[in-house]
């Protein structure tokens, strides 16, 4: 699929693309090395997510992938000082996506739901703390993607939660004959 619209559902990884399968499971890590994770986030952002690329390498068709930051991420957590929150702040700074932190002990689910309802665009709720169906229903009613994946130290995995992926396809042949490309 090329383009945007409704062909990109949920977290925004295009079907058939190199990042698509990572959304079908959860990656977890024990004892994330924060310094190494931050370095990897920066490396992956600069070398992968800010570059247009064609992983197929076909001569007859270009399938260019490019990435755009989403509009906002809410995170529901129990401990705002947890290392995972520091990594989310790093991802937010790199991608330019605003991060709004909601601490369970400080904000009710209804209050967070009200804040989410006032948001617009491509917004995600990252759930890192136990929650109820009430909050999930509020997010769903607002058209917000709920993301329950744990934060990882892998920039390639983590930064996909902060972007939407666009595929641009271009035919480079005519009746089976390759066209001269500039």
Predicted regions and their residues:
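C-terminal segments
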Residues: 1-182
